[in-house]
Structure formats: C-alpha cells, structure tokens
C-alpha cells in the first residue's frame, strides 16, 4: 500500500493510494468526532455512494449534495451547505468528508476551512484529476466571474484516500482529462514518469491496473514532495501551475462550460510550451516531444472561435499575477520548468495563437 506523507509546518498527513481504501474510511475519522457531513454530488453518490456507505458504517453521517459542474463552483452553494449543516446539528466537533472530483474537493475543503472558523476535512477523490492533483495540498476555493479560484484558503486535510478502483467506471473524457495532469507532472519534475507515459501509453489508456496504479502513485508522490517543501506556493510549488495560467484563462473565457479542467490545462501546456520555445527557454526538440505526448493522449476539444486577444486579456486576472506582471511557468527540458515574468505581450499573443491552431 503506497502511502506518502505530506509534512507542513502546521500538520502532517498521509496520502494513501490503495485499491479498496474507501472501505476503510472509518478508521480515518478521529475519536470524539461529532457528526460527519459527506459532501458529494448526486451523480457521484449514485455511482459510488455504496462504497463509502460501507466504509463509514457505524459513523453518524449526513449526505449533502453540491450541484455538478465548474460553472457552479461559486460562493452561494457553499453558503447553502453551511446553512444545512447548522440546521442538522453541526458544531465544532463535526467534520467534512469531500467525496467527488476536483470541484467537490475544492468546495468541500473551503466549506470546512470557513465553517465555525475551521473544522477537519477528509479528502476522498473520485476522479483521476482529483486523485493526482486537486485533493492533495490543502488548496480550497471557489471561482468568481473574473477568474478561477480567486476566493479560497489553504486548509490541509486529515488524510487523502485514493482508490484507483473507483476509476473503473469513470467516463473516458474524465479519465483523459486526468491523464493530462499526470503528463504535467512528468514535464515539470518527473522525466521517468514522462517516459513511462510514452512507452506504456496503450496500457495507460486501456486502464490496466498496474499502469494506472503506477502513474497515480508517482504523481501523488511528486505532489506530496512539492507541497511538503513549499505549502503556500512561495517558491517550488509554483511549478505545479504549469499549463494553469493559460488554462484558467480558457476556462474563464468559455464560462467554465466548454472544457473540463484537465482539458484546459492540456491546452494551457501547449501554449506554455510554445512560449517557452519562443523565449529560448526550451529546445525545439524537447518542445516537439512534449507536444507529441499531449497529442497522443488527446484529442483536446476544439478551441476554434476563441479570440486570442480575449485570452491574453484574461491573464491579468490570474491569481499568480503580481503588480500587473503575469508569471508564467515555462519548460526548460523534460523534467524541469522555470518561472518567468516580464514576457513581451507580443510573444504571449503569438504563443496563444499557435496553441489555438
């Protein structure tokens, strides 16, 4: 059973990767915990609810449903859930279990962070993207019309329980969206994982258990190491934003309705790779290899009809922009990236246009 420790100045917890771990969820509920509120969506609960019901047998639980979709990742649903928790007897001994994909992880984590100034949360991700990224590291939050995750907080979970078996029924589009995040891990820090994704592509796409378990474990290990080194994104953790600056602009420009988050990140990585080559940070050879691997795990939904100028304007509202300067994570080589600012607007626009083709 791979289990990776996340060590931050305030806390330490396990990110467990194990088939069947959801059935053991009750052992991660601390003694003297009051009522447990499982935050999920109707769709997740319909397909995966029985597994968690078994895992939490004997625990005093309430099930709360969030609306699905990135366009519902707003403050209002969080406030509504908080009201329901009060009505159902929540107090400071209560805790939240986040059971769903990345949107649920973010929103349920944010709910736990602000309810009565903070109660514990247990993260149980049910999509590949959430398992390798969103559930680990304590980032929580919701979107504004202006941009993604502009309201939020850091709130580390008690643990992260990742069960690869739950992905067996995940739709292909959702599965591929998660694979793009794993490609990101390979590009930014894990060259061996990048090579594995290339050589074992057919096994990964076919969801062979040994391949799926390997790429999840390697991605979780990497994320745990980075978060342990830099919880608050002061330095190293910024590399995890590779593809996200451009990707968030694409999501906001399309009102969070046209692309899954992983698909937007895949497009954002393409734009960042083009920009990295234009600015001389990465060789043409490595650039081609990165773009080809992303394409092999495609297709990304068409991005036609989106003005490049609109996307460029959105970059200013990215939460990583400091004093009007957009910070870009650009590739240096496979397994290494760098953070740069002050890139000419003309080059940024050219990179966006190249990625839109």
Kindly give the residue locations of the regions a language model identified.
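C-terminal charged capping/lid subdomain of soluble metabolic enzymes
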Residues: 2, 180-182, 281-357
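ATP/NTP phosphate-donor binding region
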Residues: 1-95
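Short glycine/serine/threonine-rich phosphate/pyrophosphate-binding segments
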Residues: 103-110, 131-132, 248-249
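A glycine/threonine-rich phosphate-anchoring loop and its flanking beta-alpha core
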Residues: 7, 16, 110-203
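Catalytic, metal-anchored helix/loop core of enzyme active sites in primary metabolism
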Residues: 9-11, 229-231, 254, 346-357
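Active-site segments that bind and position negatively charged phosphate/pyrophosphate groups
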Residues: 195, 200-309
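Alpha-helix C-terminal capping segments
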Residues: 107-118, 253-254, 274
């Amino acid at each position: 059973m791979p289990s990776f420790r996340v060590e931050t100045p305030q806390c330490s917890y396990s990110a467990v990767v194990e088939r069947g771990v959801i059935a053991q969820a009750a052992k991660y509920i601390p003694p003297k915990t009051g009522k447990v509120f499982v935050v999920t969506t109707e769709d997740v609960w319909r397909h995966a609810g029985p597994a968690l019901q078994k895992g939490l047998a004997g625990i005093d639980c309430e099930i709360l449903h969030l609306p699905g979709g990135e366009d519902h990742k707003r403050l209002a649903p969080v406030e509504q859930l908080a009201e329901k928790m009060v009505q159902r007897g929540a107090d400071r001994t209560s805790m939240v279990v986040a059971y769903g994909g990345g949107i649920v992880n973010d929103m349920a984590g944010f709910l736990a962070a602000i309810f009565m100034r903070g109660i514990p949360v247990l993260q149980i991700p049910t999509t590949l993207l959430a398992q390798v990224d969103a559930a680990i590291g304590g980032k929580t939050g919701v979107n504004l019309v202006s941009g993604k995750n502009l309201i939020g907080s850091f709130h580390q979970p008690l643990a992260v329980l990742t069960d690869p078996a739950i992905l067996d029924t995940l739709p292909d589009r959702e599965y591929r969206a998660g694979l793009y995040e794993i490609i990101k891990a390979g590009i930014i820090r894990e060259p061996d994982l990048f090579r594995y994704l290339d050589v074992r592509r057919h096994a990964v796409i076919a969801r062979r258990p040994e391949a799926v378990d390997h790429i999840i474990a390697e991605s979780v290990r990497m994320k745990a190491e980075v978060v342990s080194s830099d919880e608050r994104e002061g330095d190293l953790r910024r590399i995890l934003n590779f593809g996200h600056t451009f990707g968030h602009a694409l999501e906001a420009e399309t009102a969070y309705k046209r692309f899954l988050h992983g698909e937007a990140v895949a497009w954002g990585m393409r734009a960042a790779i083009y920009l990295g080559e234009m600015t001389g940070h990465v060789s043409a050879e490595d650039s081609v290899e990165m773009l080809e691997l992303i394409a092999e795990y495609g297709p990304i939904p068409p991005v036609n009809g989106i003005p490049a100028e609109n996307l460029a304007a959105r970059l200013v509202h990215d939460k990583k922009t400091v004093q009007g300067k957009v910070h870009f994570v650009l590739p240096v080589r496979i397994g290494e990236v760098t953070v740069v600012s002050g890139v000419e607007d003309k080059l940024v626009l050219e990179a966006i246009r190249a990625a839109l083709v």
